[in-house]
Amino acid sequence: MSRFVQDLSKAMSQDGASQFQEVIRQELELSVKKELEKILTTAPSHEFEHTKKDLDGFRKLFHRFLQEKGPSVDWGKIQRPPEDSIQPYEKIKARGLPDNISSVLNKLVVVKLNGGLGTSMGCKGPKSLIGVRNENTFLDLTVQQIEHLNKTYNTDVPLVLMNSFNTDEDTKKILQKYNHCRVKIYTFNQSRYPRINKESLLPVAKDVSYSGENTEAWYPPGHGDIYASFYNSGLLDTFIGEGKEYIFVSNIDNLGATVDLYILNHLMNPPNGRPCEFVMEATNKARADVKGGTLTQYEGKLRLVEIAQVPKPHVDEFKSVSKFKIFNTNNLWISLAAVKRLQEQNAIDMEIIVNPKTLDGGLNVIQLETAVGAAIKSFENSLGINVPRSRFLPVKTTSDLLLVMSNLYSLNAGSLTMSEKREFPTVPLVKLGSSFTKVQDYLRRFESIPDMLELDHLTVSGDVTFGKNVSLKGTVIIIXNHGDRIDIPPGAVLENKIVSGNLRILDH
């Protein structure tokens, strides 16, 4: 906890302390304002307006950060949502499709969140450029999906990438390869906010550059920034002018987040005549999902509650699969007109996520972020849809990558679907150890991806390699202890087996 926050806490515990607390807060805001003004003076003329918008946005967020303390929800007010506010996907699908699918598709814009790097998987550059299936990247698959829609229905669904300053340059270099695809591709940038020193709460950056000493001084402030940066880019007004009505927003690493025509039809032709301004796709929790944000009823509106907002005594209750059965997939359908209205009224309310980081030099900093789904409570007639698990297929680790590269899935026009040869619709639980964390190491350890159609659970730990045409079935646990190595031989069939010890296979 910073010295300033400690001072504030002490001040609050004393009589008449609120006035003292307000003085400290105002002094701190003034100090931050001066620092930001100094930084702005270093902006080149062609970047001045853009930088000013970013720093103004940060100031508003910082002001709110100083006002809010403690958990942001009153647990006593949290209720289960009314049944009609979260619809089962089957009910949406049962309505069928309109006669003229192209007319509803032409009202849609697809937005992919493309601000993340591949560092957690040992890759440099944007995560969207990592190969995930038959040498296709996340971005390749996305373009293929939308091109397939446009060709099939003779439509003009554009793709918009929300980049960050970390991914923008590399992404733009690659976009020329899609020039001959039937997809118009647009990009805009997330804001760039300054990290603040955890003790002084002042910006770490001394100027606008993000090279040299300033490399770690800036950050993209979470995907909740989409509303302001999309509006500021001018694209929002452009699409409204073209007659577009909804954006479908999702993470680019969620391979299940394809355009769903049934959900789109429900939006364009609401059964009760009242248009939904915001739809969140949620899916049933499994054991691994207990920390995911969940939809609740709060003060009469649908609200996304994240684990960080929950008071500590209620965290276990929040994780309970029996009480809170679904979690947010971050597949969102949002009205463009509503975004414009709320943005112009400054009425989009999102909780602040305080994300502590330690820089390479050891300095402790804070970055203030927001999440796109948290804005659900600001929109009118919001709806949750409980979708099948197949619409949530994120690739966060090489364990996830193994699943999507395997014969569990087939690839068609950029979309992955579970193989009909798998008897169970559930996905196996795969845990690969630290030797597999980096994509480069992971690929080196598999001569070919094993047959996993009958696999339930795979755990691999230590120095392990797989030969060609290996088949894994049931529960398979492979543990090579420190100093040992296990080579699974080509053609091996492992069914309900624990493999340990030392097994070397060398070329003769």
From Swiss-Prot:
One Gene Ontology MF term: metal ion binding
Major enzyme class: transferase
Catalytic activity entry: alpha-D-glucose 1-phosphate + UTP + H(+) = UDP-alpha-D-glucose + diphosphate
Keywords assigned by UniProt, alphabetized: Acetylation, Cytoplasm, Magnesium, Metal-binding, Nucleotidyltransferase, Phosphoprotein, Transferase
GO process terms (BP): glycogen biosynthetic process; glycogen metabolic process; UDP-alpha-D-glucose metabolic process
Spans annotated as Oligomerization: 457-508
Active site per the UniProt annotation: 396
Pathway, per record: Glycan biosynthesis; glycogen biosynthesis
Positions of modified residues (Phosphothreonine): 426
Modified residues (N6-acetyllysine): 438
Entries under CDD domains matching the protein: UGPase_euk (cd00897)
Homology family: Belongs to the UDPGP type 1 family.
Subunit structure: Homooctamer.
PANTHER family: PTHR43511
Protein name, entry field: UTP--glucose-1-phosphate uridylyltransferase
The organism of origin for this protein: Sus scrofa (Pig)
